[in-house]
Amino acid sequence: MIDGVLEIVDKHRPLHLSIVGGDPLVRYREMETLIPLILEKGVHIQLVTSAFRPLPEAWASVPGLNVVVSIDGLQPEHDERRKPATYERILTNIQGQNVTIHCTITSQMMRSDGYLERFLQFWTPRNEIKRVWFSIFTPQRGDSMEEILTPSERKQAVADMLSLRERHPKLDMHPKMIAEYLTPPESPESCVFSMTTKTISADLTTLITPCQFGGDPDCGSCGCIASAGLKAIADHKLGGMVPISAIFKASIAIGRLVSGEERPPVPQKAEFPILR
């Protein structure tokens, strides 16, 4: 596995590599070996975990490594959904660390007044927490799941985040990024994140398309924080005139022309429904 990942890194030469679920810490011995080798290549790493086991002590101060702990809401909801990675276990396993907390906002949360603030009040005072991020639940097209936010709930979630970031500085999300949750990309072809990333499954061969959600994501309901962040950058206009998105798209087109790479077609049905 280690050699395979390093081969992929050498082939694609990414600026950033995310290692995500299941849970990378299932292979914690390989992670302890692999992460320094990737960092030596100048690649920033983001490792997403449930923190079901203790994090290596050295990870608390490794430059270029961001450990993200996924939390599914407040303790009652999270513990029911994430056993054995309960709040109690997470708090024990992140002691002495320096982690990012990530939570995906669902409709159930928005139906409970003050839910997001209570979440921040629990996590942000802790020394181990350097920042908190919120995503919004992203469905596949045609889904009718209880977690899907209504349009009014999405607007309220954005308003809440904009307000909460003023009172909770560890909610490390720029206002323009938060606002992008109201105008997500219409398709993978117009999503800067989808266009600039490559997602590879655990077999180190299978590509997950059209983005990390796989299958047929409902882009109009996208709540991906990475997509929102890159769209906020892409929408910025240099000199107030030229949107950065034009530079992104031109660079991508040139890169594909030089490499001979073609963008894979969007699948007709969900094949890799991963990661929320």
Where does each model-flagged region fall?
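Flexible mid-to-C-terminal extensions adjoining Fe-S/redox cofactors in radical SAM and related proteins
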Residues: 187-276
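Short glycine-rich, flexible loops that bind phosphorylated cofactors or substrates
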Residues: 26, 54, 76-77, 231
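Radical SAM enzyme [4Fe-4S]-AdoMet core and its adjacent flexible, acidic
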Residues: 10, 41, 65-194, 235
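Generic surface-pattern signal
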Residues: 14, 83, 125-128, 149, ...
